[in-house]
């Protein structure tokens, strides 16, 4: 139903679907993976009762910035995507959208996001420039380093300190435990994503943690996920979260075990499905946080 609704926009303009695909609005998994951790931080910062204004700002800010990230990513990869089986049909790689049009769209999305941030406070506004820098840099990192997933993790986690400053006007040291947890988790699930493209990436010279980790990939992913859970446990102790939060962590841990099992043969589709499955882990942790505050 969601996809059909998006496809109906072609009635408004024949190229609308191309731009929807460029922003990946037809594939909301990236929105979820960015949204859940941002909401973890917002709920914890507000002790379970975030303001309606901030909830609106961060939900729509996530949607806009994820779309902007996809646009600049495809712009950076436009000469690579045509050589990768999974990405060769993307609008920029296939020529349906021109690079100049993509840059204009990126500027519009970033501007809209910044307008939302203007309704917060000075600290959050200043922090937003760091998020923009990370989002703009990430797509180019795979040309120069085997750690682009770390930059992605930093970018995907940046909304968390912003949520704290928007809600409370301050950034307590323990908030960085949430940030580090999400960074580690992002590196883990995006390595699964990179494993799906590893053979194509090796041919075209693109770098990733999947290539760097080699045969130790699944073991390192499991270790990163374990460290992420440990950071969340420590953060939970500092923020005095209780049984429901810990129940959410247990569900997330079960998700990680399932992913480890399903990727034992390292088949590309299994790795891609493991990446997608992380949405449920993030949701479980969010539900745990919400229930922990709501049922006190």
Curated annotation (Swiss-Prot):
Catalysed reactions, as listed in the record: all-trans-octaprenyl diphosphate + 4-hydroxybenzoate = 4-hydroxy-3-(all-trans-octaprenyl)benzoate + diphosphate
GO biological process, one term: ubiquinone biosynthetic process
Annotated TM spans: 29-49, 55-75, 102-122, 124-141, 146-166, 169-189, 216-236, 239-259, 271-291
The protein's annotated pathway: Cofactor biosynthesis; ubiquinone biosynthesis
EC number(s) stated in the UniProt entry for this protein: 2.5.1.39
Cofactors required: Mg(2+)
GO CC list: plasma membrane
GO MF annotation, one: 4-hydroxybenzoate polyprenyltransferase activity
Protein topology in the membrane: Multi-pass membrane protein
Keywords: Cell inner membrane, Cell membrane, Magnesium, Membrane, Transferase, Transmembrane, Transmembrane helix, Ubiquinone biosynthesis
InterPro entries: HB_polyprenyltransferase-like, Prenyltransferase, UbiA_prenyltransferase, UbiA_prenylTrfase_CS, UbiA_sf
Pfam family, one: UbiA
Subcellular location: Cell inner membrane
Entry's family note: Belongs to the UbiA prenyltransferase family.
Main function: Catalyzes the prenylation of para-hydroxybenzoate (PHB) with an all-trans polyprenyl group. Mediates the second step in the final reaction sequence of ubiquinone-8 (UQ-8) biosynthesis, which is the condensation of the polyisoprenoid side chain with PHB, generating the first membrane-bound Q intermediate 3-octaprenyl-4-hydroxybenzoate.
The protein, known as: 4-hydroxybenzoate octaprenyltransferase
Source organism of the structure: Ectopseudomonas mendocina (strain ymp) (Pseudomonas mendocina)
